[in-house]
UniProtKB/Swiss-Prot annotation:
Major role in the synthesis of nucleoside triphosphates other than ATP. The ATP gamma phosphate is transferred to the NDP beta phosphate via a ping-pong mechanism, using a phosphorylated active-site intermediate. NCBIfam families: PRK00668.1. It holds the Pfam family NDK. Its cofactor is Mg(2+). The gene is ndk. The active site is at H117. Its EC number is 2.7.4.6. Gene3D superfamilies: Nucleoside diphosphate kinase-like domain. This is Nucleoside diphosphate kinase. It catalyses: a 2'-deoxyribonucleoside 5'-diphosphate + ATP = a 2'-deoxyribonucleoside 5'-triphosphate + ADP; a ribonucleoside 5'-diphosphate + ATP = a ribonucleoside 5'-triphosphate + ADP. It comes from the Bacteria. It is an enzyme of class 2 (transferase). Belongs to the NDK family.
Length: 141
């Protein structure tokens, strides 16, 4: 049994609508272990650093405005196949076509305000986790 870790973010729209507990409960119900968690309010520099791979895309400025508009909750999730399983559970970016039962189907407002983020690969998960957490803040079981 090989456990993986992935980064999850509960985005500003979900935080502002008091969905943190609901999302965490659903994660635990799906077998994800939360091994690190914190709430923070990103400044522009932090948001741009995190989303640097999107800096040349048309939606970048809107994404940065959104991600700095209110607090977020960042979590490190652990389970077998964590990256793939969490991405499946999140649903597609566009909530209008997200599958029933996914987080984005249930909670997203639109493609930008889509409630949650998840790492798209193991390599990116490692980079994203390190962006927000020191090793001493992660309590792997």
């Amino acid at each position: 049994m090989t456990l993986e870790q992935t980064l999850a973010i509960i985005k500003p729209d979900a935080v502002e609508r008091n969905l943190i507990g609901n999302i965490i409960s659903r994660l635990e119900d799906k077998g994800f272990q939360i091994i690190a968690m914190k709430m923070l309010h990103l400044n522009q520099e932090q948001a741009e650093g995190f989303y640097t791979e999107h800096s040349d895309k048309a939606f970048f400025a809107e994404l940065i405005r959104y991600m700095t508009s209110a607090p977020i909750v960042v979590l490190v999730l652990q389970k077998e196949n964590a990256v793939k399983d969490y991405r499946t559970f999140m649903g597609t970016t566009n909530p209008e076509i997200a599958e029933n039962g996914t987080l984005r189907y249930e909670f997203a407002i639109n493609q930008t305000q889509n409630s949650v983020h998840g790492s798209d690969s193991l390599e990116n998960a490692q980079r994203e986790i390190a962006y927000f957490f020191a090793e001493a803040e992660i309590y792997a079981r």
